[in-house]
């Protein structure tokens, strides 16, 4: 399952069955969650979970590759992550002669650990709530289209300004990521350190790591050994560096240990990592749009693509290995789209959303304000107007970007510019595809 870096997940639960489910920013734990966590059994200081200025659990939970969570489990940079997260790198080193996808791989010494081209491990150094600063920048900067508040390119410039003002140390391996949250009502700056010399240490055979395959994916309970191991390397003085034979295993600030005493009913537990995003604040029209555009396209187009890929992969071990990661990646959200639509219908989510909306609108009327109704109507109007654009953009993404492996597809900014210049949606997206 794919995870993208948008926020940190913090799910609280006890094994007795009660769960305080949700997503919380680590920066908000002390204010919003500390009392509840202590009541549920947390026996360490909140500052040991997250503290921007000292060592905490944030230094042992990493962003693995492009969108996964990893855990540091040794003092010398050993990273544990999911099998599906390491899958493309297992494939990277596989061949017909050395089929690590099928047979698994274990390095018996440091010299046998395999460098993974393109793989990074990212540490979050600190998370800063920069909402007041960003809003001041938005107020003073020119924004003729009114899109700066969500524009990645604009927010990247603001992040650099803030870093210069606050004298945040920047190296070639530092990354600044400024992200809007809660509908751009709050902005967080992630200051990150990226390690680029990461080597594969071990992975089980796919018969274990992918047991159940697409049938079990996104389903619970699971019965697969979904894990793989990698190691972070750095310069002898512990600095991030590109791959070099002289690099050594990173001496990490903190690593996680396993309590060999096991667990018992009622123990306090939490999950910390990079889960991506959720859409719980969507109105019913947006949920319906998701079902009819994104999910519909994923299911329809990827079914054809996956069938064609599988047919060729079954003919040749070489082709099977070459396309294993692309097949798995495509199948991942193909299954997600199918299951999501089925779940939304089965659980009558649209009906629930409509009841929630009416309750909120009724509250607004009781309070003597039409602000809620105006906001709701505005969102509905936008969703209605953009339907064709979203439909065609998703079709282009699935067919041209994924289906034929084109390197670029038109950005939303380019699509909007083309529409401003008078193109019809269909012609705009098709013309921009080749710019």
Name the predicted role of every residue range.
Residues 4-13:
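Sec-dependent N-terminal signal peptides
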Residues 15-19:
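Sec/Tat signal peptide C-region and signal peptidase I cleavage site
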Residues 59-76, 255:
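A conserved glycine-rich beta-strand in the N-terminal activation segment of trypsin-fold
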Residues 80-124:
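Catalytic-histidine neighborhood of serine endopeptidases
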Residues 89-92, 276-286:
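Short, Lys/Arg- and Gly-enriched loop/turn segments at beta-strand edges
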Residues 145-232, 238:
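Long, charge-dense accessory insertions within large macromolecular proteins
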Residues 290-376:
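Charged, amphipathic alpha-helical linkers/stalks
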Residues 434-435:
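Conserved small/polar residues in nucleotide/adenosyl-binding loops
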């Amino acid at each position: 399952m794919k995870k993208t870096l948008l926020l940190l997940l913090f799910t609280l639960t006890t094994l007795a069955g009660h769960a305080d489910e949700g997503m919380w920013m680590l920066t908000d734990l002390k204010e919003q969650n500390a009392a509840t966590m202590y009541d549920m059994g947390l026996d360490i200081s909140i500052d040991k979970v997250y503290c921007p200025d000292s060592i905490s659990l944030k230094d042992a939970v990493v962003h693995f590759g492009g969108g996964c969570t990893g855990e540091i489990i040794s003092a010398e940079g050993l990273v544990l992550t999911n099998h599906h997260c390491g899958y493309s790198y297992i494939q990277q080193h596989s061949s017909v002669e050395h089929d690590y996808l099928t047979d698994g791989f274990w390095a018996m010494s440091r010299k046998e650990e395999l460098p993974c081209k393109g793989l990074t491990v990212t540490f979050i150094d600190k998370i800063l709530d920069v909402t007041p600063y960003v809003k001041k920048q938005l107020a003073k900067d020119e924004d003729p289209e009114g899109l700066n508040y969500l524009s990645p390119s604009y927010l990247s410039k603001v992040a650099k300004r803030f870093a210069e003002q606050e004298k945040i140390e920047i190296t070639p391996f530092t990354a600044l990521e400024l992200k809007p949250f809660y509908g751009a009502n709050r902005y967080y700056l992630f200051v990150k350190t990226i390690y680029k010399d990461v080597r594969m240490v071990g992975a089980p055979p796919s018969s274990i790591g992918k047991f159940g395959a697409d049938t079990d994916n996104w389903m619970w309970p699971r019965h697969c050994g979904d894990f793989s191991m990698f190691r972070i390397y750095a310069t002898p003085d512990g600095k991030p560096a590109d791959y070099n034979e002289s690099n050594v295993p990173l001496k990490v600030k903190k690593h996680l240990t396993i309590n060999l005493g096991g667990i018992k009913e009622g123990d306090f537990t939490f999950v910390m990592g990079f889960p991506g995003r959720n859409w719980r604040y969507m109105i019913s029209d947006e949920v319906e749009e998701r079902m009819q555009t994104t999910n519909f396209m994923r299911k329809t187009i990827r079914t054809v693509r996956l069938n064609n890929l599988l047919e060729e992969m079954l003919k040749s071990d070489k082709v099977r290995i070459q396309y294993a990661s692309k097949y798995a990646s495509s199948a991942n959200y193909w299954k997600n789209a199918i299951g999501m639509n089925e779940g939304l219908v089965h659980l009558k989510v649209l009906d629930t959303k409509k009841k929630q909306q009416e309750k909120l609108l009724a509250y607004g009327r009781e309070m003597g304000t039409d602000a809620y109704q105006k906001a709701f109507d505005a969102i509905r109007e936008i969703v209605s107007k953009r339907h064709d654009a979203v439909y065609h953009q998703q079709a282009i993404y699935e067919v041209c970007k994924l289906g034929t492996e084109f390197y670029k597809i038109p950005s939303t900014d380019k699509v909007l510019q083309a529409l401003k210049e008078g193109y019809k949606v269909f012609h705009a997206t098709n013309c921009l595809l080749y710019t």
